Amino acid sequence: MNPWRRYSWEIALAALLIFEILAFGLINPRLLDINVLLFSTSDFICIGIVALPLTMVIVSGGMDISFGSTIGLCAITLGVLFQLGMPLPLAIIITLLLGAICGLINAGLIIYTGVNPLVITLGTMYLFGGSALLLSGMAGATGYEGIGGFPTAFTDFANISFLGIPMPLIFFLVCCLFFWLLMHRTHMGRNVFLIGQSARVAQYSAIPVNRTLYTVYAMTGCASAIAAVLLVSYFGSARSDLGASFLMPAITAVVLGGANIYGGSGSIMGSALAALLVGFLQQGLQMAGVPNQISSALSGALLIVVVVGRSVSLHRHQILEWYSRRRNAHQA
């Protein structure tokens, strides 16, 4: 297939991203400064880090809306462990393991109950979120202050750069490469697509369906934990609400990136570009003085438009056939 045609959606997203940056640059010229542009990604790049493995979950025919609560739980756990005197490197490792465990819990409940993944992860969203609030209350970390006192080397980590590129953005680029290779260049990635197209056929084809689902959900949980660590480093405090605003932007990024909400198709590159598109939309509106409520409403509207557009695109042949029948009936 012609590469231009194969990656037409990704090319369109890249062009739209450039247009968006230029448009906001006309409103606020600071956004056209390369340093401001790069470092402004630190405010939203964790959305992209979570959206990448979430793409694999959605392509497999699943759904995970608990990652925001997982981020909050992992963040406050990191703070509590450090507060109890645990060495920070060990606390970070345990936090990453906790994120993976949250993902495994989601996968286990989905596989062994057969309940819709949206319902299961809705329940675990409240479970993890409630656990984060409980842990926060027990540690006395209520309100917006959270748990602070982290070493300067840790709090500086998310604010330093390498070759002029902010460290969170470097993490995002590394994650992009890793998940692109995993999804588009390995047997596991092929299995994810096949499971999303038909889990029953995949089962009959001797594809390890359960193991694959455990892996993609665990990776989403682990990515949530990575996002939690970066956010704690960036803000300098561990709070239970750090991932509260991630749900809609991340899902919007995955769907806008080309993933079929019913499973079977999707693109890591598309999700990465869409995450930047959604992030710069929020950032640009904020720099233009638009209130957060309007920014959130626009993100929600964007998700609705994308879902409707994708649905029309998927069923365009049936729509054209219906329209043709209607026209012929009127002519008769």
Curated annotation (Swiss-Prot):
Statement: the UniProt record of this protein carries the keyword Transmembrane helix: yes
GO molecular function: transmembrane transporter activity
Main localization (coarse): membrane
Any Pfam family the entry gives: BPD_transp_2
Keywords, sorted A to Z: Cell inner membrane, Cell membrane, Membrane, Transmembrane, Transmembrane helix, Transport
Family annotation (CDD domains): TM_PBP1_transp_AraH_like
Membrane topology: Multi-pass membrane protein
InterPro entries: ABC_transp_permease
Annotated localization: Cell inner membrane
One CC-aspect GO term: plasma membrane
Reported induction: In the absence of AI-2, repressed by LsrR. Induced by AI-2, via release of the LsrR repressor.
UniProt signal peptide: none
Ranges that cross the membrane: 7-27, 45-65, 70-90, 91-111, 118-138, 162-182, 216-236, 240-260, 261-281, 288-308
Function comment: Part of the ABC transporter complex LsrABCD involved in autoinducer 2 (AI-2) import. Probably responsible for the translocation of the substrate across the membrane.
Subunit field text: The complex is composed of two ATP-binding proteins (LsrA), two transmembrane proteins (LsrC and LsrD) and a solute-binding protein (LsrB).
Family to which the UniProt record says this protein belongs: Belongs to the binding-protein-dependent transport system permease family. AraH/RbsC subfamily.
Cited PANTHER family: ABC TRANSPORTER PERMEASE PROTEIN YPHD-RELATED-RELATED (PTHR32196), AUTOINDUCER 2 IMPORT SYSTEM PERMEASE PROTEIN LSRD (PTHR32196:SF71)
Record protein name field: Autoinducer 2 import system permease protein LsrD
UniProt organism field: Salmonella typhimurium (strain LT2 / SGSC1412 / ATCC 700720)
Source organism phylogeny: Bacteria, Pseudomonadati, Pseudomonadota, Gammaproteobacteria, Enterobacterales
Gene name linked to the record: lsrD
